[in-house]
Amino acid sequence: MEPANDTTVTEFILTGLSQTREVQLVLFVIFLSFYLFILPVNILIICTIRLDSHLSSPMYFLLANLAFLDIWYSSITAPKMLVDFFVERKIISFGGCIAQLFFLHFVGASEMFLLTVMAFDRYAAICRPLHYATIMNRRLCCILVALSWTGGFVHSIIQVALIVRLPFCGPNELDNYFCDITQVVRIACANTFLEEMVMIFSSGLISVVCFIALLMSYAFLLTMLKKHSSSGESTSRAISTCYSHITIVVLMFGPSIYIYARPFDSFSLDKVVSVFHTVIFPLLNPIIYTLRNKEVKAAMRKLVNRYIFCKEK
């Protein structure tokens, strides 16, 4: 997508997370460790669910899709951020900025919708166990996942369409380590009140509505489970799982609401919240959603033994 004709800015300067060399090196080691955990673990999750016939239920199909989105979500900002720790002048082209913005909102919104679908899956499994296979059949799962991706795509197109029509004539400095609408809109050479309101309505509304829907669904599930708390270990595990999922929901939607559901003014906490939103959240997803699952862990060990250590068991 090309900028408007009156656009003179061809690149943006990113301020990064810190200007201190020692701090940059520490952050590089930390974020590289996170990224090198996120990529192989999520790839292993996808391969395990794909290759193990015992993990064919809708829940695991949704987990594989979540792992795929996490790979892309973490890869939108992390590689450039890691390279920029060693670059004096951190720049990104106008086209690169628009691409980063597009994929950030595409994958991020898709993940929000997918988390909502996963909450519905948990509701069906816990509250309608006898009808679960009928309700959450493979066809419905594919439709819900496709709708999640489509919703994310439409949302992202709206953000990009609003940005590319704005004129940029300087300054061109973005006070962050990646491109996002909250920084880009602030440096446009025009009155952006209408665009800002549409973006807040779009991004903020998605975040708030999904967040409230998820909290209500998990509150309902916890109420149902605690009524049957005498059922034994399986109920205790389900309650623990719900609390873990609520943690992810808060960590995902809290920063998103803070960033997008308010006027796009600059605050001192913006960069810290952005780190939680783009780095910490993809790190915790596989830990809480998948690696606490005994069936998945057993299947992963089996897969590693078979294909890496060449052992059948």
Swiss-Prot record:
* CDD domains referenced in this protein's UniProt entry, alphabetically: 7tmA_OR4N-like
* Reported tissue expression: Highly expressed in liver but not in adipose tissue. Also expressed at high level in testis.
**What are the TM regions of this chain, as residue ranges?**
26-46, 58-78, 98-118, 143-163, 205-225, 239-259, 271-291
Query: According to the UniProt topology, which residue ranges lie Cytoplasmic?
Result: 47-57, 119-142, 226-238, 292-313
State what the entry records as the consequence of deleting this gene: Compared to wild-type mice, mutant mice fed on a regular diet show a remarkable decrease in body weight, food intake, fat mass and plasma lipids. Blunted response to Asprosin, including attenuated cAMP levels and hepatic glucose production, as well as improved insulin sensitivity. Mutant mice show significantly reduced food intake in overnight-fasted mice compared with wild-type mice. Male mice display decreased fertility caused by impaired sperm motility.
What PROSITE patterns does its record include?
G_PROTEIN_RECEP_F1_1 (PS00237), G_PROTEIN_RECEP_F1_2 (PS50262)
Q: What effect on the protein does mutating R186D have, as reported in its record? A: Reduced affinity for Asprosin
- GO cellular component terms? membrane; plasma membrane
Supply the SUPFAM superfamilies for this chain. Family A G protein-coupled receptor-like
Sorted alphabetically, the keyword list is: Cell membrane, Disulfide bond, G-protein coupled receptor, Glycoprotein, Membrane, Olfaction, Receptor, Sensory transduction, Transducer, Transmembrane, Transmembrane helix
State the InterPro entries in the record.
GPCR_Rhodpsn, GPCR_Rhodpsn_7TM, Olfact_rcpt, Olfactory_Receptors
Q: How does it sit in the membrane?
A: Multi-pass membrane protein
Please provide the Gene Ontology terms (biological process) for this protein. Answer: adenylate cyclase-activating G protein-coupled receptor signaling pathway; G protein-coupled receptor signaling pathway; glucose homeostasis; positive regulation of appetite; positive regulation of flagellated sperm motility; sensory perception of smell
Location(s) in or outside the cell: Cell membrane
The residues on the Extracellular side of the membrane are 1-25, 79-97, 164-204, 260-270
What GO MF annotations does this protein's record show? G protein-coupled receptor activity; olfactory receptor activity
Superkingdom: Eukaryota
Q: State whether keyword Glycoprotein applies.
A: yes
Glycosylation site positions: N5
| Intrachain disulfide bonds | C97-C179
> What family is it from?
Belongs to the G-protein coupled receptor 1 family.
- What is known about what this protein does? Olfactory receptor that acts as a receptor of Asprosin hormone at the surface of hepatocytes to promote hepatocyte glucose release. Also binds Asprosin in the arcuate nucleus of the hypothalamus, thereby stimulating appetite by promoting orexigenic AgRP neuronal activity. In testis, Asprosin-binding promotes sperm progressive motility and enhances male fertility. The activity of this receptor is mediated by G proteins which activate adenylyl cyclase, resulting in an elevation of intracellular cAMP.
Any additional notes? Answer: The mouse olfactory receptor 4M1 (Q8VFT4) is not the one to one ortholog of human OR4M1 (Q8NGD0).
Q: What is this protein called?
A: Olfactory receptor 4M1
What is the species of this protein?
A: Mus musculus (Mouse)
Q: What is the lineage of its organism?
A: Eukaryota, Metazoa, Chordata, Craniata, Vertebrata
